[in-house]
Amino acid sequence: GKISMKKRSRIIPVLCTLLVATFLFGTVSATNISMIGNTVTEPPLTQEELEHISECNALIEQQLARDNLTRAIYNNYLSMSVITQENGYYCGPATACMVAKTLGLGTYTQKEMASLLGTTTSGTSGAQICNTLNSLLSKTSDTRRFQRVTISTAALETSVRSSLRNDFPLTLNVKEMPNYTSGSGHFIAVKGYYFNTSTDFKTITICDPHPTYSGTYTYTLEEMETAVESSNGYYNRLDASTV
């Protein structure tokens, strides 16, 4: 039916408030941050890459088996500073900048790194990050290289231990984080870990470039496994054959 002028005067401000809120924040949700987006399709692993991952997994098992004979607690933390991404699709460049600086490969602006990566408004792929960082490493005396893997082809726990025991960071593609949900995909860097194999207490420390939640955070191993699985499952670790 018809709305009286008195009722209409009360409704209009409410509607305006809702419209403004929707425009500024999108769908209201405490955990859905719509400004984050990385929709680039990750190229599938080739047969050659899969075979090399298996070879590296065997090398890692040998390395860690020797470690397990001497102690039950393992931990290492890299000196990595958080870089907050400048826009909604620069999580890849920001993460690559953090890793490059940590490895002594130079200090890049996010725009410079985005150019090297080939980042578009759709974001960046893990393959682009892996290849670009390896290209920068090849220009130094550092023989270590990144290897692109999936959580189904390489266990995150052993990858983290292997990489960080060699002072080498990892990059993860995540979606469902413990404190927020990315609309599509989001890159973060792993800077440290603490694993107690006798009590099964295991944590991973990451640097997150998220424009709202940027910072250093520590989560359980299980939480980070879930975060990677919720996205495309890809991440970049140390190629164990290059150590």
Where are the predicted features?
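Active-site nucleophile-adjacent alpha helix/oxyanion-hole segment immediately C-terminal to the catalytic cysteine
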Residues: I73-T120
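Short, Lys/Arg-enriched N-terminal segments with co-localized hydrophobic residues
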Residues: G1-S4
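Sec-dependent N-terminal signal peptides of Gram-positive bacterial secreted proteins and lipoproteins
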Residues: R8-A30
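Short, well-ordered loop/turn elements at secondary-structure boundaries
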Residues: K6, L19, Q85, R165-D167, ...
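Conserved active-site-adjacent core of cysteine acyl-enzyme catalytic domains
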Residues: N32-L50, S54-L69, I73-L78, K111-V243
